[in-house]
Each structure stands twice: as structure tokens, then as C-alpha cells.
A protein has these predicted regions:
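Helix-to-loop junction immediately C-terminal to a conserved catalytic motif
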Residues: 54
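Conserved ABC transporter NBD signature motif
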Residues: 62-75
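Catalytic Walker B motif of ABC-type/P-loop ATPase nucleotide-binding domains
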Residues: 152-156
């Protein structure tokens, strides 16, 4: 089967500031209707990369194709950008801000749709400087959608938000993706990447060091999930299971690609599961395996 044409294709992207290589030989393909996450610690090159993709900065070298053609000046008219740092005018209300952007870039008939999509209804008469961090981000997301973009850029969309606001924003972004929009985001949150992204490109020191779906990367670099049982379990019963297990110093570890099926198999053997725990790897563990450092270094 022929691979579908990517909506955005980047080859050998490089950005140098005097003696500093901020982006080093980055190549990416982003397919329509998917979410790609650039994941990495501060200073990894994520923001510089996305700003080049947004056409804010020119690359030192490399090519960028949009819908199969070299990126042109009209590119900005077809994309939406939610910046990491808000630049809202304090004295305007949410309604005034959204109306202004729609007047400049959008369709007045889209106002109600954007208000509903980004859950802004109760905030319309509130001034921008009275909004919480999560409310500001929802307004910024609505502004990024004003021109009905086919491609949306989100730079650290949930940084600084409390857990509930972060989860609410993710649900809105996930719904936007479900409507067929293509999303590229930067994040240093492995939870955000696992929740939103179909593909992630893990960056470190300006380079992509791993790329793929979160599930595939976790399996490739960290192996299976594991069920942990106390040493009191009768290991003779485990001999009949088609799973790799090992007795460690203070526990028994059973590796499995399907945790729920394994638990069901243990139950049929009348193994006491009251002391069971589950160890699951995540993208933080992948980054640690690749670099020896934590994502939040």
C-alpha cells in the first residue's frame, strides 16, 4: 500500500546561532489528522524546531514541504499557532478578543462554534487579565482556530497549569484532532505526549534520538510491562504459564505484553493477587534509557 502524502515533510533541518547548533539534522513526516509531539527537556531544540516549522524563523539549512510543495508565503494563512507565552491585551474581554481576531482572520459565523469548542461561554465578559492560566490557554487555542487551519502548532500548551486545567485542555485538543485537524506540539510532559500524540519525536541537544508511537518506543526501549508478586507466591504454579518470569531479591516479576490476560491466567491458577502491583514503563523511562538523564533535567 502506498504511504499517504504527509501534510508536512521536513528534511535535514538545521539552525545555527553563531557557534550554537540549536537544531541539528532534523527530519520529520507529519500525516493528516495525526498529532506529532516533539518531546524533550528544556534546551533540547523543541521550541526552535517548531518556530522554524511555523515559519517564524528561517532554517540555516534543510527543506520544508507543505502538502507536497515547497512551503510558500501563503502557508501562514492555513495554519494556527498557540504560542507558549500569552500576548493577550489585558483591557479586552474574552468576547472582544475573539471578535477582533475573527474580524481580522476568520468568519463571524464561527464565533459560537469556537466559544463552544473551547468552553469559553462563561468567560465572555471577563477581562483577559482576570483569566486563570487554563482559561488563557483555552482562549489562545480558540484564537489559533479562527482561520480554520488544517495544521495547528501548540508550543508547551499545558505548561504551568494545574492538573484539572491540564486535563481539560487535553480533552479539547483531543476533540479537535478527532475532527480531522493535524497537530504538532512541543512538550516536556511524557503524560501529555502519551495522552495526545500518535507519534513522538524525542529530542536531545538539537537532534531527534528516537521517533515512533509512544507504545512502540516504550516497547522497543523498555520492554514489556510487568506484574510484581510477593515472594510468598507458589512459584510451581507459575511454571505452567507461557510468560517469562523471574524471582528477584524481594519480589517475583512476570513480563507481559498483555497485563489483563496475564492477570486472568494467574487467577485461574488460584494465585493470591492481594499483594500484586504493576510496573509500567513510560516515555520518561525511554528518555532515561537513551540519555541516562531525566526529561526534566
Amino acid at each position: 500500500m502506498t504511504e499517504p502524502q504527509p501534510i508536512l515533510e521536513v528534511k535535514n533541518l538545521r539552525k545555527v546561532y553563531k557557534t550554537i547548533v540549536a537544531v541539528d539534522d532534523v527530519s520529520l513526516k507529519v500525516h493528516p489528522g495525526t498529532c506529532l509531539g516533539l518531546l524533550g527537556p528544556n534546551g533540547a531544540g523543541k521550541t526552535t524546531t517548531i518556530e522554524i516549522l511555523e515559519d517564524i524563523f528561517e532554517p540555516t539549512a534543510g527543506t520544508i514541504h507543505y502538502k507536497g510543495q515547497p512551503r510558500r508565503g501563503s502557508f501562514r494563512e492555513e495554519v494556527g499557532i498557540q504560542f507558549q507565552h500569552t500576548s493577550l491585551l489585558n483591557y479586552l474581554t474574552v468576547k472582544e478578543t475573539l471578535r477582533t481576531f475573527i474580524c481580522l482572520y476568520g468568519d463571524p459565523e464561527e464565533f459560537d462554534t469556537l466559544v463552544q469548542r473551547c468552553e469559553l461561554g462563561p468567560l465572555l465578559q471577563r477581562r483577559n487579565n482576570k483569566l486563570s492560566g487554563g482559561q488563557q490557554q483555552r482562549l489562545m487555542l480558540a484564537l489559533a482556530l479562527v482561520n480554520r487551519p488544517s495544521l495547528i502548532f501548540l508550543d508547551e500548551p499545558s505548561t504551568g497549569l494545574d492538573p484539572q486545567s491540564r486535563r481539560n485542555l487535553w480533552q479539547i485538543v483531543d476533540q479537535i484532532k478527532a475532527e480531522g485537524k493535524t497537530i504538532i506540539l512541543t512538550t516536556h510532559s511524557m503524560e501529555e505526549a502519551e495522552y495526545l500524540c500518535d507519534e513522538v519525536a524525542i529530542m536531545d541537544k538539537g537532534r531527534i534520538i528516537a521517533e515512533g508511537s509512544p507504545e512502540a518506543l516504550i516497547k522497543q526501549y523498555c520492554g514489556s510491562s510487568a506484574i510484581l508478586l510477593p515472594l510468598s507466591v507458589d512459584t510451581r504454579k507459575l511454571e505452567t504459564l507461557p510468560y517469562l518470569w523471574q524471582q528477584q531479591k524481594d519480589q517475583i516479576r512476570i513480563d507481559s505484553d498483555d497485563i489483563y490476560t496475564t492477570i486472568a491466567a494467574l487467577s485461574t491458577l488460584n494465585i493470591d493477587l492481594s499483594g500484586m502491583s504493576i510496573s509500567s514503563a513510560n516515555l520518561e523511562d525511554v528518555f532515561l534509557q537513551l540519555t541516562g538523564r531525566q526529561l526534566r533535567d
